[in-house]
């Protein structure tokens, strides 16, 4: 088991101990909306075949660079500082002018310094309860992730293309789509996507788990599937503004956990 390499808005690090025990037996594990891939990194044992997919090209580049060019990636941070000014400079840098390794380093830096792990509308995050990321120990911190990513397929596909490509009877799709009516993910996600997701869950060969914010519209679309609720507190605005709030996380499955049993 390792840890996620970047903060991510809506990441499931704090829910891992409640979600992973629900995983069904499987041979192929697919994170269709990988994001920070918390469950992938934190599951106690790897699946024989594993896939990380995301539509965010910067994120996919980061995973591929850590997977294949870790030493050169780490070298990008030799003289780096955790600074509001550097953060603003990195935001102004056009990614298309950079090499893949430089682009991955820029994305890594921004995600580690952005408030709440947002991808868009980023502001420099400050904390008084813990130290800033130690940029001199990146190689030490990423070595476990490098080993974990070895042999994993990293895809940059629309979610439905990835799900259909890897769907087999022995596949488990974990889907953590953007929350309905929530901004900050860096991608538009119309409601029709949730409807297509529910249709896929009804027709696919494999098992599917969806984690999403609890909303009447979501419950209506996924009616007929097994629901479980967990509580979680997310902060997506400055705590001084009083915007830290508890919310319900809806876990949707196209199988009955009690009948099938768990993997771990």
Model region roles, listed by residue range:
Residues 25-85:
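Conserved S-adenosyl-L-methionine
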Residues 1-15, 22, 37, 67-174, ...:
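SAM-dependent nucleic-acid methyltransferase catalytic core
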Residues 63, 179, 222:
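Conserved active-site tyrosine of GNAT-family acetyltransferases
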Residues 57, 112, 254-256:
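Non-catalytic surface loops within mature trypsin-like serine protease
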Residues 1-49, 160-172, 182-264:
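Class I S-adenosyl-L-methionine
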């Amino acid at each position: 088991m390792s840890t996620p390499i970047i903060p991510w808005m809506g990441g499931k690090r704090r829910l891992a101990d409640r979600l992973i025990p629900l995983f069904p037996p499987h041979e192929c594990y697919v994170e269709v909306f990988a994001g920070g891939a918390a469950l992938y990194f934190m599951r106690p044992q790897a699946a024989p075949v594993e896939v990380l997919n995301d539509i965010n090209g910067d994120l996919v580049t980061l995973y591929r660079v850590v997977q294949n060019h870790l030493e050169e990636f780490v070298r990008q941070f030799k003289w780096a500082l955790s600074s509001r000014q550097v953060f603003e400079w990195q935001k102004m840098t056009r990614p298309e002018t950079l090499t893949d390794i430089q682009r991955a380093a820029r994305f890594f830096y921004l995600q580690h310094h952005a408030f709440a792990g947002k991808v868009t509308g980023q502001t420099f995050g400050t904390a008084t309860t813990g130290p800033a990321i130690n940029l001199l120990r990146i190689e030490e911190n990423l070595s476990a992730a490098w080993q974990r990513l070895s042999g994993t397929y990293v895809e940059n596909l629309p979610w439905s293309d990835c799900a259909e490509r890897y769907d087999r009877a022995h596949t488990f799709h974990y889907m953590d789509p953007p929350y309905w009516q929530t901004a900050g993910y860096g991608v538009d996600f119309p409601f029709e996507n949730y409807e297509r997701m529910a249709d896929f869950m009804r027709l696919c060969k494999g098992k599917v788990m969806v984690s999403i914010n609890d909303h009447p519209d979501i419950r209506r679309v996924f009616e007929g599937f097994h629901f479980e609720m967990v509580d979680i507190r997310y902060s997506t605005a400055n705590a001084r503004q009083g915007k830290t709030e508890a919310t319900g996380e809806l876990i949707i499955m196209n199988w009955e956990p009690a009948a099938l049993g768990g993997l771990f």
